[in-house]
Swiss-Prot record:
Primary location recorded for the protein, binned into one broad class: membrane
KW Chloroplast (keyword) present: no
Gene name of this polypeptide: scpZ
Signal peptide range: 1-25
Record's function text: Probbale cyclic ether formation enzyme; part of the gene scp cluster that mediates the biosynthesis of a hirsutellone-like compound that has still to be identified.
Protein name: Probbale cyclic ether formation enzyme scpZ
Superkingdom in the source lineage: Eukaryota
């Protein structure tokens, strides 16, 4: 295993851990109160800006995000699915970036995560 592959695995596992943290933040405020509050406040805006065509409630969208974050965490944690998980992560981050741009919010968090995922993909 090359050092680039190990580097990619470390980045992928870091993204998996962050995705698991996002699941926790969507479900409870106990460990990440500020992050949870931010997600809770921004979710309705993102629902109206990007996901209006789904016609689902904010609460349902929250569980869609939780499910997607679980999918990403599991796929990045499993070595056989890691490449696919990175590609799915990149696609979801592009949607988040688009949503930020549409709402006039700072795209920096999604750009940083896109850079990390992109580096992991290139290093594979």
């Amino acid at each position: 295993m090359s050092s680039l592959h190990i580097f990619s695995d470390v980045l992928a596992l870091s993204i998996a851990a962050f995705s698991a943290l996002c699941v926790q933040a969507h479900l409870t405020k106990r460990f990440t109160p500020t992050f949870s509050k931010n997600l809770e406040e921004k979710l309705p805006q993102h629902n109206k800006a990007v996901f209006w065509w789904l016609g689902i409630s904010d609460n349902a969208l929250r569980y869609v995000f939780v499910s997607l974050n679980i999918l990403v965490s599991v796929s990045l944690a499993l070595a056989d699915l890691r490449t696919t998980g990175l590609k799915v992560s990149m696609g979801l981050l592009f949607i988040g970036f688009y949503s930020d741009m549409k709402l006039g919010e700072s795209p920096i968090p999604h750009l940083i995560l896109c850079s990390v995922v992109g580096a992991a993909i290139v290093a594979r």
